[in-house]
């Protein structure tokens, strides 16, 4: 634990990425200095013609969406007949210490979207963003809208903030002095160590994610049991310092992304109000990182979009990763979008089981006709290596 810099939450020796987590079959079909693009092997006789791209948070590894076959959202999407791709962020090293928010939007998300369209031959794709991956996706879509380009046919946003006026517990730690210190620290580049992120998120829930394990591991001498989700939680990543400093100031501190024209990204003024596409917004009721009020606020930020908002039980991760087959927990729907989440909940209907069923029903008619599947990649973009690729296996030192 001293060497790792954090208290062990699970028996990490039980897991290996690509062996028993992140095991969905597929291939890396494109890579650059920021990400690898993975396309998954079809599991159905026919697939929808419009491809589907998943964008996870760059502050974690992508395999939270592909833990094991029985709780993999990736596998669920593939089983629904979607030609599924995912963006696997590289764990930043010294070569990436200068990378900015603009780099992640342009060379990351926008490039990934373009490559998916080139590989599939489609004109538009369906795209999903999770946590800060959703915030970055909304930014990328706004950049494209300013350029009068629309690559996305629909967008799904899972537990993400666009309006940071209600950022939850994290907002208590961020003020002008803290942000200015980080900006000075990373003015010439540098990396935010993975351990800093891991410990920050752990101490947001100290009784559950710190002291519980201190007592069991150190006082009782017990060995933590294997748990795939906690293994992923411990497999944190570094972040480029300039990216991190920009994110702190323009979201948590000044909430500038939601102010039309207040922020310039990739040479374009950001205006979420110019986005015009069907969107599915999901928030978790007990989320301590993206409060349900903050998740719901996106319904009013995306004022020109055809929107559906759904609330699930549980928290930031467990609420999202709630496989349909296990029939656990519940979710709420309401076709109306009143001004507050309190009003929305009052008019909502509770459903037993996973919200995945509702989302699948929403996405299917947006995915086009079905046709015979193809192997991952094409003649130009051939398989580089099997999924999950080597980027996700790079551990933070």
Over which residues does each language-model region extend?
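Catalytic histidine neighborhood in serine/cysteine hydrolases
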Residues: 248, 298, 302-338
């Amino acid at each position: 634990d001293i060497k790792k810099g954090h208290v062990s939450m699970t028996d990490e020796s039980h897991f290996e990425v690509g062996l028993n987590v992140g095991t969905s079959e597929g291939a890396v079909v494109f890579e650059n200095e920021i990400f690898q693009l993975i396309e998954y092997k079809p599991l159905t006789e026919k697939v929808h013609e419009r491809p589907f791209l998943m964008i996870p948070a760059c502050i974690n590894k992508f395999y939270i969406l592909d833990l094991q076959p029985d709780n993999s959202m990736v596998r669920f999407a593939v089983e629904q007949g979607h030609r599924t791709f995912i963006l696997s962020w590289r764990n930043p090293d010294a070569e990436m210490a200068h990378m900015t928010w603009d780099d992640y939007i342009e060379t990351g998300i926008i490039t990934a979207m373009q490559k998916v369209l080139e590989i599939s031959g489609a004109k538009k794709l369906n795209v999903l963003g999770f946590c800060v991956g959703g915030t970055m996706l909304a930014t990328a879509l706004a950049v494209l809208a300013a350029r009068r380009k629309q690559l996305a046919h629909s967008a799904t946003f899972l537990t993400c903030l666009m309006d940071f006026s209600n950022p939850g517990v994290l907002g208590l730690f961020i003020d002008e002095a803290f942000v200015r210190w980080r900006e000075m620290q990373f003015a010439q580049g540098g990396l935010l160590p993975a351990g800093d992120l891991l410990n920050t998120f752990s101490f947001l829930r100290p009784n559950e994610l710190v002291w519980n394990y201190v007592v069991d591991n150190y006082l009782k001498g017990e060995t933590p049991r294997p748990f795939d989700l906690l293994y992923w939680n411990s497999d944190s990543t570094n972040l480029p310092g300039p990216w991190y400093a920009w994110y702190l100031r323009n979201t948590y501190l000044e909430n500038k992304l939601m102010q039309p024209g207040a922020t310039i990204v990739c040479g374009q003024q950001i205006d979420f109000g110019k986005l015009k596409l069907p969107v599915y917004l999901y928030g978790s009721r007990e989320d301590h990182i993206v409060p349900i009020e903050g998740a719901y606020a996106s319904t009013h930020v995306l004022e020109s979009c055809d929107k559906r908002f759904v609330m699930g039980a549980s928290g930031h991760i467990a609420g999202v990763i709630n496989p349909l087959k296990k029939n656990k927990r519940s979710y709420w729907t309401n076709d109306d979008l009143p001004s507050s989440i309190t009003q929305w909940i009052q008019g909502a209907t509770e459903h037993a089981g996973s919200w995945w069923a509702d989302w699948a029903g929403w996405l299917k008619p947006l995915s086009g006709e079905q046709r015979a599947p193809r192997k991952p990649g094409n003649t130009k973009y051939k398989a580089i290596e099997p999924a999950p690729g080597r980027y996700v296996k790079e551990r933070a030192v």
